[in-house]
Structures are given as C-alpha cells and as structure tokens.
Amino acid sequence: MTIAIGKSSKEPKDLFDTMDDWLRRDRFVFVGWSGLLLFPCAYFALGGWFTGTTFVTSWYTHGLASSYLEGCNFLTAAVSTPANSLAHSLLLLWGPEAQGDFTRWCQLGGLWTFIAFHGAFGLIGFMLRQFELARSVQLRPYNAIAFSAPIAVFVSVFLIYPLGQSGWFFAPSFGVAAIFRFILFFQGFHNWTLNPFHMMGVAGVLGAALLCAIHGATVENTLFEDGDGANTFRAFNPTQSEETYSMVTANRFWSQIFGVAFSNKRWLHFFMLFVPVTGLWMSAIGVVGLALNLRAYDFVSQEIRAAEDPEFETFYTKNILLNEGIRAWMAAQDQPHENLVFPEEVLPRGNAL
C-alpha cells in the first residue's frame, strides 16, 4: 500500500466561492448573483407602490386624491410624481427636501422616485437573472435580449422623458387612470399617434399578437393524434419525447392560404421574437425623441388650407384641433401651479362646428 504524504490539493474556499455555491445552488426558486439586485429592488418597488396607493395623497403635488384612504379604487389610485417645483431632485428621504421626515417625504412625492429607480433596477435584475440562468444551463440568451424591450420602454417613459422635460412632474404617475392621463398628455402635447416610432411600436405589438394567435392555433391544429388509448392526444403529455405537431402539414396549410409560409422553425420563432422586440425598441427611441421635444409628422399645407377655406377639413386637421383642445383644457387642470386661465373664445373649434 502506498501512502502519499503532503499538502492537500483541495484549497479552502474563499468568501466568493462560498457565496457563489449558496447563491447558485439548485433550489425551487433560483437566487443567483442577479437575485442580489432583483429581489430587494422588486420588494421595495412593489412595497412602495402598495403603500403609496393605500395611504399617500397627491394633494400637495397635483391637487388630487390618489389613495384608497381618500376613496379611490384600484383604477383611480396612484403614486403621483413629485411637484414640478422639485424639478429632477432624487428626493432622498435624508435629502434637503424631506430632511428625514417620512411623512413630508411622502407628501412631496418621494415614493415616486423611490419606485421608479427601484423598479428600473429590478427589471434590469430580472434580465440579468435570465442571462445567468441561461449561462448555467447552456442556453442562448435570447430571453434576456427579448426582455430588454420592456426595460427600454420603462426607462424611456418613466426616466428619460421627464429628464428631458422640466422635472419628474411630467412623467407618468404609477396608476391605471394616471397612465391614461399621461397618454392623453402625450397625444395633445406631442401628437404621439402620428409619430412614426409610435406607428412602428403599434405594428410590432399588434403584429406580435397576431403571430402568437396564428402560431398557437396552427400548432394546436396539427397536433399528432397518437394511438387509440383513453388519452387520445398524447401530444398533451409533458413527458412525450417525440415531436408533437407536424411542421410539414402546417407549412402546406399556410402555403395554400397565403401562397407563402415558414419552412423553418428557427426562422419562424426568430420572426416572432423580432417583431415585438423591435416594435418596443422603436417606441422607446421615439419617446427619447419626445424628451427632446422632437416633432412628429406635420402636414402644414393642409393646416394652411383649412385655415383659409371653411369648407376644407381633413382627419389630420381635425386631430390637430383636438390636440389644441387637449392642451388648452389639460394644461389648466394638469398644471395648477401655473395658474393658467383660457377664456372660452380661445378654445379651438373645427370648421365643422
């Protein structure tokens, strides 16, 4: 028998290796290094939103009631943006505005910046989580790449747009009706629906919905009917190892319907990835443009002719007048600190009126 005497080749683990072993251990809910960013940020963002919508008023920032405590419901409650006078202050609890007073911090709109930044980093943490897991199980990172699209939209709408304006005040508040108000604001002040980047975003989202419906229906239509047992459709069995539907049949069907069809599964699924992700990224780029007050399409010749000819009006000129109406009515209500007053005679009226 040979006995080897000497130093063990197995060195003791350092702190990093110990943490790595624990964080990336196979468990029911994966934690990972990304979880150090994701879980705290998601917890604080959601907790801040539930706290704000339940208890915190918007009286001091918008002159509105916005909490369940004041009588709002799920659709009308919101965590509102800080007042316009606070510009782009981070509104830290210990900052010069609140000076450590939690009640004052909530009244000033501190919860909005708290939720916006923790929410943004939480979303980034979720994308990193997908990268980390994909690397662990040797998958391509397309899930994480796809998730970059909603992150781009969130960051552009909630952070970049108000940074381009005079303050966080002009970002969307975190609530259902508040988001609707923001959409009306975008239309009235930026003519957003006529912006080509918005058009690409709509095409991407609705096109993706159409592709999802067609793809799901086609797969269900071409499931193999295997055997004559009690469970006729073995394709619904999650342990079935063989292919569950016929790509050849699907290709033949759509070739007859449209004259063209996907003949390759990889190209088909890449297209389903490409359409919505590109659409959302285009929308995000468009919102960055709005942050800089870039204009959408302007058809000035139609506006001039409509102004000169009482009988000439197009859907475009009607929409321009609607936008003027939104600006006139919304500015006075939405920016009470400006003390704007518009007499009846200056409110826009179309030629049809």
UniProtKB/Swiss-Prot annotation:
Binding site for chlorophyll a ChlzD2: H118
Membrane topology: Multi-pass membrane protein
Chief location: plastid
Cofactor binding note from Swiss-Prot or TrEMBL: The D1/D2 heterodimer binds P680, chlorophylls that are the primary electron donor of PSII, and subsequent electron acceptors. It shares a non-heme iron and each subunit binds pheophytin, quinone, additional chlorophylls, carotenoids and lipids. There is also a Cl(-1) ion associated with D1 and D2, which is required for oxygen evolution. The PSII complex binds additional chlorophylls, carotenoids and specific lipids.
Transmembrane segments: 41-61, 125-141, 153-166, 208-228, 279-295
Binding annotation for pheophytin a: Q130, N143
Alphabetical keyword list: Acetylation, Chlorophyll, Chloroplast, Chromophore, Electron transport, Iron, Magnesium, Membrane, Metal-binding, Oxidoreductase, Phosphoprotein, Photosynthesis, Photosystem II, Plastid, Thylakoid, Transmembrane, Transmembrane helix, Transport
Modified residues (N-acetylthreonine): T2
Modified residues (Phosphothreonine): T2
Catalytic activity: 2 a plastoquinone + 4 hnu + 2 H2O = 2 a plastoquinol + O2
Extra facts: 2 of the reaction center chlorophylls (ChlD1 and ChlD2) are entirely coordinated by water.
Task performed by this protein: Photosystem II (PSII) is a light-driven water:plastoquinone oxidoreductase that uses light energy to abstract electrons from H(2)O, generating O(2) and a proton gradient subsequently used for ATP formation. It consists of a core antenna complex that captures photons, and an electron transfer chain that converts photonic excitation into a charge separation. The D1/D2 (PsbA/PsbD) reaction center heterodimer binds P680, the primary electron donor of PSII as well as several subsequent electron acceptors. D2 is needed for assembly of a stable PSII complex.
Protein name, as recorded: Photosystem II D2 protein
Name of encoding gene: psbD
